A protein has these predicted regions:
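ATP-dependent carboxylate/acyl-activation modules
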Residues: 1-269
């Protein structure tokens, strides 16, 4: 990016999936900037800041701004080739091909295929002239729900025992719902102006308090630079976007006795 007079946040997110396409889409919707993935241009009409950042200009692709991948997506929609984008950005063609596949996705494809490529219910709804709730209900009715995998910190050398999970649209779960009394805590998501580590401190203290009361604890967060995403802090960590869809998927799976939303700042509320 470029230095300027406007204060900007330095927060980050981390997303995990079975494929790059699934992961990058989850990462973008974790950012909490009003987008649900690699979005088309019209998704920014209501936000002048994002709209200005998305003005289509191939020469600007040389600069590694926070919106460059969205601009690359727009370039593919406008018919540019992988070779053309590579000459400007020098991004490895493999990644460019993956972004191109997202950009040119056929939304008439089966929902299962769209979900495997990381498309959210909101994205599918907007691109099929439907409603998010209708897409969600149809998906659940047809048993198209995510499975949850454990992060293998040992590269399959021996069995990993870390309670560190992510969702994907696969057939099998690596885990079962936690047994006993359990409470879910929604983390603060990415750090940004007005949303910092003070909220993460509150989430961690909530974990300690719940343990004293005899509850198992479940954390949902997508910020890799926080204490709340340390895998050994809680009984189970879901490294997922803190969005309605992703949180409700976890609630449907775990069926916790309660959910604490007041400790994570603006995001959970």
């Amino acid at each position: 990016g470029h230095l300027g007079v406007q204060m900007q946040s330095v927060g980050e997110v981390m997303a995990i999936g079975r494929t790059f396409r699934e992961s990058i889409q989850k990462a973008f919707r974790s950012l909490e900037v009003g987008i649900d993935g690699l979005e088309p241009k019209w998704a920014f009409e209501k936000d002048p800041e994002l709209k200005r950042a998305r003005l289509f200009d191939l020469t600007s692709l040389r600069f590694a701004t926070s919106f460059r991948l969205l601009k690359i997506r727009e370039a593919f929609v406008n018919g540019k080739t992988v070779d053309e984008i590579f000459e400007i950005t020098k991004i490895d063609p493999w990644f460019l091909h993956q972004i191109k596949m997202i950009a040119l996705e056929d939304y008439s494809s089966p929902i299962k295929k769209l979900k495997e490529n990381g498309f959210s219910d909101a994205q599918i709804a907007k691109n099929t002239n439907s409603a998010t709730e209708k897409v969600r209900n149809s998906r659940i009715k047809n048993k198209i729900t995510p499975s949850y995998k454990l992060v293998d910190t040992c590269s399959a050398e021996f069995k990993a025992k870390t309670p560190y999970c992510y969702s994907t649209y696969d057939h099998e779960n690596d885990i079962e719902p936690i047994k006993g009394k359990k409470i879910m805590i929604l983390g603060g998501g990415p750090n940004r102006i007005g949303q910092g580590i003070e909220f993460d401190y509150c989430c961690v203290q909530a974990v300690f308090g719940l343990r004293e009361l005899g509850y198992k604890t479940i954390m949902v967060n997508c910020n890799p630079e926080t204490v709340s995403t340390d895998f050994d802090l809680v009984d189970r960590l879901y490294f997922e976007p803190v969005t309605f869809e992703d949180v409700m998927n976890i609630i449907d799976f775990e069926k916790p006795d309660g959910v604490l939303v007041q400790f994570g700042g603006q995001t959970p509320l």
